[in-house]
Each structure stands twice: as structure tokens, then as C-alpha cells.
Amino acid sequence: MDSWIWQPGYPLITAELNSAGNALTLRQQRFSFDHDSHALTQTWLVPIHIRINDQVSKHLLVGDSLEIEVADSHATIVVNAGGYGYYRVAYASELLGRLKGTEIASLATIERYSLVDDAWNAVVAGRLQAIEFISLVEEFSSERDLAVWQAIAIGLRSCARLMSNTELPKLENRIRSLVAPALTDIGWEQGANEDDLRGKLRGLLVTLLAINGNDLTAQERCRSIEFGHQGHDEIIHPDLLA
């Protein structure tokens, strides 16, 4: 426990396959946004759960690195399976690219949230390209969890601030393609016995589609809802109004 108690920060675990695809190398250093040189020298005793396809194995990372045998060179690999670990994960581009919609949908909610949150923080830290983050979250079209969408929204809104005027319309188009199916699925109207999280998700999706996606149809729908309720006793759902 000393490694966790007597030094600052927490680990970043990087995951990379060798060229043959039969060995996974995990390396650790302290997570840092500013690439502090001291972070490279810090290590922890890190319990790690890894899922390779459907098989979960447990490992203890002691020191700088750990090599794990991989039988299937094309396997889908998830580090921090179950979301139990107190560390961030940075996948090599090849491993990140293997996480497609079907595989992502099968992950637990905390795993999906961590995947998005770790990826965006990797962008902020200069370890991942913004375009790679966008490509990753495009695989979340079937996502219906509010917390995961909040993590996606933080990243997409920040990406928009990085785009030039010529590049921004391309991002808006990709946001529309991602968000529209989810909003269509949950609908614009509050359902019977709907929980609060569903309403908050609707409000978030509408904002993403209408503002960040610059969707003209969604913008017009918002105007019609607002103006259509003026002078009436019916109340617009607060999350949709916001």
C-alpha cells in the first residue's frame, strides 16, 4: 500500500501489442497533463483485470512493465475489465481501433464510461489525436446511459473548440450522425413513468444535436416546442427546456 499512500497521483497504464500480436505489454507511469519528467519514475503495485475476448485474467503490475501472452492475435482486449482499477488506460491505436460498436455495447456501463473518459483525458494530455477520440465515440450510437453521454459530450464540445471554421461543419455532421439515432430512439416527448435520468439524457441529446450538431430540424423543433407552449398551462419538461 505504500506506493499508493506515500506518493502523489495515480497510474496511467499503456497497452500495446507486439508486432506478431501474441503478446500484450502493459507499462505504467504517473498520469500527468504536462508530461512531468518525475512522473516517468513513479510506479505502483497495480492489480489489473484484463479481458481478452470473453476471458478475464488478473495480474499484478510490479515495476515498469508486464508482458501477457495473447493466444488470439485479433482479439478484442479490455484493460481494467469491470472498472475496478484506480488508474487510467491508454490503448495503442491498433487496440483502440478494435473496440467497435458491438464490442462496446457488450461492456459494463462503468467500462464504457471509463473508455470515453480515459480517451478524452488522453487527448487533453497530448497522447491521443482528437480525430481518434471522435472515431471512438462514433461507435457509441447504441449508448443510452446518461453518464456515458455526458463524457461523450464533454469531449465533442471541446473538440469543436479546436476546429477551424472549415473543419467545424465536418464535425457537426459527425455529431448529427451519432446523436440523431439515440434521440429518435428515446423520443422528444416524456414517456409515462419515465425516470429523471431519461429526461436528463433527452435534454443532453437535444442540446448536442441542435447546438453542437447544428441540426436545423432539431433547432426548429425546439422553437416550435417553446413557442407552442406560450400562453398555455402545460409545462415543458425542465431538462428539455434547458
Where are these regions (language model features)?
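Non-catalytic accessory/interaction domains
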Residues: 2-242
